[in-house]
């Protein structure tokens, strides 16, 4: 993505020398048959004022369907998880149609595990990108994750965080 049209244009707009950028390479294990695949934002993108803090999560069963932009007719669980509120309520925006009706992709326990990880990631990276670094305004991290039981088949799936990076912010 370093040389995609969009990133090239953005560097040009901001006057960044194209030869001064580097590309990072991330290598992680393969997840050929994960139980759940998702992306999350560690702040509520629908709440610019910060008055309704929540984690925004898109998650799909398995790994066959794209999560954020699935094929036509496929829906993911899309939700707001109010992790810091009493009883940690979850508001579903859409439900996956790849799981049985009236069920969710993640269990309550998995949602809580994800919330703990997202909270830790948000807090840790605040030192570089958020309020702890003196930055003001809306701050969030974009996190890719999986739940997989390959290391212990038949046991509850383990949460794997594939990557976390600064979220560009409310569509900007």
What does each model-found stretch correspond to?
Residues 1-172:
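Conserved mixed alpha/beta core segments that line enzyme active sites in large multi-domain catalysts
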């Amino acid at each position: 993505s370093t040389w995609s049209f969009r990133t090239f244009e953005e560097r040009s707009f901001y006057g960044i020398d194209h030869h001064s950028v580097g590309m990072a390479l991330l290598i992680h294990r393969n997840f050929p048959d994960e139980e759940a695949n998702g992306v999350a934002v560690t702040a509520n993108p629908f709440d610019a004022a910060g008055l309704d803090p929540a984690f925004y999560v898109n998650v799909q069963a398995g790994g066959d369907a794209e999560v954020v932009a699935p094929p036509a007719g496929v829906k993911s669980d899309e939700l707001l998880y109010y992790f810091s509120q009493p009883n940690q309520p979850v508001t579903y925006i859409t439900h996956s149609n790849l799981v049985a009706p009236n069920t969710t992709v993640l269990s309550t326990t998995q949602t809580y595990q994800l919330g703990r990880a997202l909270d830790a990631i948000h807090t840790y990276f605040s030192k570089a990108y958020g309020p702890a670094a003196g930055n003001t305004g809306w701050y969030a991290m974009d996190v890719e994750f999986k739940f997989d039981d390959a290391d212990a088949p038949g046991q509850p799936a383990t949460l794997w965080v594939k990557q976390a990076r600064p979220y560009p912010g409310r569509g900007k």
